């Protein structure tokens, strides 16, 4: 079964309505979806929950961005295929890409997990993750550093790491 079919089946079998009115609820909703989706993957192919949450926070402004609200896109996932449903940036509607529209917010998380697991741009992420898996060491900072290519912001990975650290401190409270 292709990863696209698997993604669709997972989304069809688990389609929570992400209902949040504050940042804590946003975190809880993203975590619930990510936990379920990760359970559908081998342990070595899972994406750490706090990494997903941190990127969703930054890419969607806590689920409040236009792309999150109108397109259910929590992770800033772009498409260059004009056949895909997409939203263009309001300040630059003539760009050759758009942000992909998803049926649900959870579907955008599923797509993100599969993107990291299969897209050639994220081979460094997969390499670091498998190294950590076999050494029983989980270092989210090292994993986050492999995702510099994910965004145009040169400080992106530092922002993600800071947010991961804040989430981990929040979890300890």
Where are each of the predicted segments found?
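Catalytic cores of secreted/periplasmic lytic hydrolases that degrade extracellular macromolecules
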Residues: 1, 5-53, 58-173
